[in-house]
Amino acid sequence: YLVRSHHSWGLGDLTDLADLCTWSASQGAGYLLTNPLHAAEVTGRMEPSPYLPSSRLFVNPIYIRPELIAEYHDLDQYDASLVESLRTTTLDDDPQALLDRDRTWQAKSQALELIHRVDMSASRRMAFTAFRVARGRRLEDFATWCLLSELHGSDWHDWPAELHDPHGAAVARVRCEHADRIDFHMWLQ
């Protein structure tokens, strides 16, 4: 996250990491050690420590580069310019400035929501469906937790009692009522 490029959104992302890996390999490096990229809380302030994840099974979507998602190129002109405008809100002229994960995630999540609304090509839809099947119930449960965290806060103890059972009728109802938002959280993975 500290290694940034001119295309970054305020902190380094997976594309910056790939570039660093390529450069490191060209310099003779056999491996590159990174901090964990685990999923963080979806609400409130983003925890700066990668050692306090909300899940070790899923990744933090803050490391996605929105412009490299295939559907980004199908945005209309207005939404594409909005995504670029959101990116500029994350930039800091001072390379020594502290990373602002909250500012980056606020902007990036809005951009990702715009991109998620674009219809996928048939092959991308098939790949996403295959991914969902492969990741199974854990992915759906994690995405449901993300949604419930957005609605009720990240501590499930504070949720209405009927939402404490992830396989109960109330959670099943929420999954149906908010299927699009749950799909978004699965898509982020």
Residue ranges and their predicted role:
Residues 1-189:
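Acidic/aromatic-lined carbohydrate-recognition and catalytic surfaces
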